[in-house]
Amino acid sequence: MKLSTASFFARFVCLIPIILVTKPIYAYDELDLQKLLTTRICNDCNLIQANLDSKNLNDVSLLGANLREANLVSANLRGAELIGVDLTGADLTGVDLTGADLTGADLTGVTLSGADLTGATLWMSVLRNSAVRNATFNYSNLKDTDLTGANLIEVELVSATLNNAELEGAKVWYANFENADLGRANLMGTEIYESNLMGSNLKNAKLIGATFYQSNLNGADLTGTTLDEEASTVQGQSNTRLCNTVMPDGEVTNKDCKR
């Protein structure tokens, strides 16, 4: 039976989507990728899912760039300007971000295993539900950073600044916060397991529901905090400063206000 011209055309049109999806699709802009690699300046570029594995990108400028789901495994981004970048879902395993500026960056759901962010600026950045293992944030600025629900395993945060940081519901295992500044940070419901907070500043931090299982808070400042039963393990640790601190029994202690 012969097909009419109209019927043949209708069937051909139906096949067009099938033909189209077989073509390779690149989420990133190839011209933008080439621009980055040649000029090292690619502000507001589209680099979605770009493969930058092991690339030397130190001191590059990527202000406002879109790097969602990009592969940055073992890349060198020392001193990079990454203000406002979108790194949602990116793989940053082993990346070197020493001294990089990630102010306002979105790192939701990233993988940061083995990454080095020593001295990096992450002010007002978002790391919600991120997987951070064996990473280094020593002397970094994480003020006002959102780490809600993040997994921080074996992370180094020595002398890091986390004022007003959001860590609600985060898992903090075997981490080192020695001399870190956690003033006014939200640690409600945070699971802190075998971690070192020696000499840390926790003034006015929100600690309701936080657990400090086998963690070291010697010399920590708990001024203005409320300790419930979950946080009762901090009592009795040496040199912990308790001033205007609400104890698990509801009593307020000011025993260390003068020191």
Regions found by a protein language model. Give the residues of each.
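Bacterial N-terminal signal peptides that target proteins for export
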Residues: K2-F12
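Tandem repeat scaffolds
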Residues: Y28-R259
